[in-house]
Regions:
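Membrane-embedded transmembrane alpha-helical bundles that form the catalytic cores
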Residues: 1-210, 214-259
Length: 260
């Protein structure tokens, strides 16, 4: 993923597209992973820390996404930026403006780069559009399987689109990636890619299957795992460790959010 973003012109359109859709997964697993480790270490020491992520990529709107993603930071911006600006207490137009401005500030909080500003603006725009249609016009997707699926797909693609600005160094790099996807994309790359990277293929399949789990199914699976014999847990741990070794790079990769 990092290699593609560093030199997109040297990779195929398929690999560029895989990087664009892979980064949202990478940053979630990276950030959520070390948040979970912090929660676990704190629990060992007798302290309780609340969850910082709650199935963010199952969100059906940008508004819901920010109730599930980096919850501690979301609450901080709500309490110290959105509410002091007036929140939703000064009319609907002001509420939309406050939502948009809060997300702009969230973008700048990550760094003084136009790419972060654009990322924040996209999320602000997504919040405003969702609130306007759902609250002002009373328009929303029906709560059916088809409606939820379409709502999820639109939200997920929009979130991935916003993440591309967060990750790319500048608009030039992002433009090159989009150009490769548009002009050098072929499914003929799929078979060689999967044959050359079997461990990555298993990871990709695992991630895709994980999207099918509901919150209830996850908690049920978690409860069953806790009751497993220690030998079974050890075997599963060894399998996971082997997969990590297979896909890991030679150099140590720092956590993405450490820079923030």
């Amino acid at each position: 993923n990092n290699w593609v973003f560093d030199a997109p012109q040297t990779f195929s359109g398929f690999e560029n597209l895989a990087a664009l859709f892979g980064y949202p997964v990478q940053i979630f697993l990276d950030f959520s992973g070390y948040s979970d480790m912090s929660i676990g270490v704190a629990a060992i020491l007798g302290f309780y820390l609340p969850d910082n992520f709650y199935f963010p990529y199952r969100s059906l709107s940008v508004t819901e996404f920010w109730h599930r993603w980096h919850i501690s930071l979301s609450f901080w911006f709500r309490d110290y930026v959105y509410i002091p600006l007036g929140g939703n207490r000064k009319g609907k137009v002001r509420m939309y403006f406050n939502n948009f401005l809060t997300m702009l500030v969230a973008g700048l909080w990550h760094g003084s780069s136009w790419m972060f500003v654009i990322w924040g603006a996209l999320h602000g725009f997504g919040l405003v559009v969702h609130k306007f249609f759902s609250r002002q016009l009373g328009i929303s997707f029906p709560r059916t399987l088809a409606g939820n699926s379409l709502s999820w797909l639109i939200t997920y693609l929009y979130i991935c689109f916003a993440w591309s600005f967060f990750r790319a160094k500048d608009l030039g790099v992002l433009g090159k990636m989009c150009d490769k996807v548009a002009n050098d994309f072929s499914i003929d790359y799929l078979v060689p890619f999967f044959h050359a990277r079997p461990a990555w293929t298993l990871c990709i399949i695992g991630v895709m299957l994980s999207y099918l789990f509901t919150e209830r199914q996850y908690h049920r699976l978690q409860a069953r795992f806790i009751l497993l014999p220690w030998v079974t847990k050890l075997l599963l741990f060894i399998i996971c460790l082997q997969m990590v070794v297979e896909v890991s790079q030679e150099s140590v990769q720092p956590f993405i959010y450490y820079q923030f």
